[in-house]
Amino acid sequence: MLDARYIRENLETVEARLKTRGEGVDIALFKELDGRRRELLQQSETLKALRNKVTEEIARLQDKSQAAERKTEMREVSQQIKGIDESLRSVEEELQNFLLTVPNVPNETTPIGRSEEDNVVVRTWGEVPALSFEPKPHWEIGEGLGILDFERGAKLAGARFTLYRGAGARLERALINYMLDLHIDEHKYIEMLPPFMVNRECMTGTGQLPKFEEDLFHMEGVDFFLIPTAEVPVTNIHRGEILKGSDLPISYVAYTPCFRKEAGSYGKDTRGLIRQHQFNKVELVKFTSPEDSYEQLQKLLGHAEEVLRRLQIPYRVVELCTGDIGFSAAKTFDIEVWLPGQNCYREISSCSCFEDFQARRAGIRFRPEEKAKPEFVHTLNGSGLAVGRTLVAVLENYQQADGSVLIPEVLRPYMGGAERIS
């Protein structure tokens, strides 16, 4: 959430930078609500100061009739204050609800653009494999090996659900454990295993609510949501807390299943594992000081990249333009993995800095020093990685002409020493 004072003092800048997102923001409504709030606040404070002053005068009056008259006047003032404060609460709630719908201001270094066509390729890693045969997409590989069962997945739950079988289920589990071990043992993240359902406050804190409720799975009869990403519960671990500056940066990693309606994806990626209602993901989350956040973003991005480097799978890093970054993000880098069966790069991770946008919504602060005034932390997160899409990348990049799939060396200890799925 943006700070009302920041918007007020930087109206033209905020409006101009939000326009680069391709979203119009009702600045006139903000000015009206903010102006009314400040006016009512001033009226309330003026009358309260008057009441306090007269109360002190009454205590000094010797004339009881005069004191009674002044008390009557103050009862009227108190009624005025009550009415003004009720109006103030109403306006503050309206202003708060408005601010919750305003996206984050893109960082000034974020490339300006309208869509993914304007994103900037930062670097590529690895060579695209030159296969001596026509590569298959992962759904054909998985069905051919009997390790992915899309038909029975649909029978169990409908479209965009998959049943993993045998070596497919074990490969998914191997990827999860490999990613967790790498991030915990070498990158020094603290592992978390959060609830897979959260309350409305959590979803509001990270920015999914109120704007994107239709994309979420809501539990009927109770106000819980299935998590769309571990970002939601893990970021909210410190909701409403004041952290020690000496403890920053704090780095958490969490494996969770994720649940998404994919409401705007009708007709897209209808085959395979790319776009599912339920999928597994390993998430990286950081809490940092404002001064350190962009350095930590590069570290987080590097940690996510390392997963693919050790798997020896080609990828590229893309910086998202202002028209393509998410609602809460100030800057985002995507990692896109090469998929020979589809002859293209596909997103496998988004790594973002939200600056204080989420922290302000969730009330996450820190003290730079022991007795210093609390400040909002900066939050960061990124996939490290999306597990199903990593499995897709393994199947397509390690496929062999005979239909089998070689197992990357780093995964073999997690696969009982097996070298091939056939």
Curated annotation (Swiss-Prot):
Binding-site positions, L-serine: T229, A230, E231, E283, S383
Role noted for this protein: Catalyzes the attachment of serine to tRNA(Ser). Is also able to aminoacylate tRNA(Sec) with serine, to form the misacylated tRNA L-seryl-tRNA(Sec), which will be further converted into selenocysteinyl-tRNA(Sec).
Record's comment describing the protein's domains: Consists of two distinct domains, a catalytic core and a N-terminal extension that is involved in tRNA binding.
Gene3D superfamilies for this protein: Bira Bifunctional Protein, Domain 2, Serine-tRNA synthetase, tRNA binding domain
Top EC class, one word: ligase
Protein name: Serine--tRNA ligase
Cellular compartments annotated: Cytoplasm
Any one biological process term the GO annotation gives: selenocysteine biosynthetic process
GO CC, alphabetical: cytoplasm
Reaction equation(s) it catalyzes: tRNA(Ser) + L-serine + ATP = L-seryl-tRNA(Ser) + AMP + diphosphate + H(+); tRNA(Sec) + L-serine + ATP = L-seryl-tRNA(Sec) + AMP + diphosphate + H(+)
Keyword annotations of the record: Aminoacyl-tRNA synthetase, ATP-binding, Cytoplasm, Ligase, Nucleotide-binding, Protein biosynthesis
Chief location of this protein within or outside the cell: cytoplasm
Signal peptide: none
EC number, UniProt record: 6.1.1.11
One GO MF term: ATP binding
Keyword Metal-binding: no
Residues binding ATP, per UniProt: R260, K261, E262, E347, I348, S349, S350
Pathway connected to this protein: Aminoacyl-tRNA biosynthesis; selenocysteinyl-tRNA(Sec) biosynthesis; L-seryl-tRNA(Sec) from L-serine and tRNA(Sec): step 1/1
Organism (species): Geobacter sp. (strain M21)
Family: Belongs to the class-II aminoacyl-tRNA synthetase family. Type-1 seryl-tRNA synthetase subfamily.
Record has Protein biosynthesis as a keyword: yes
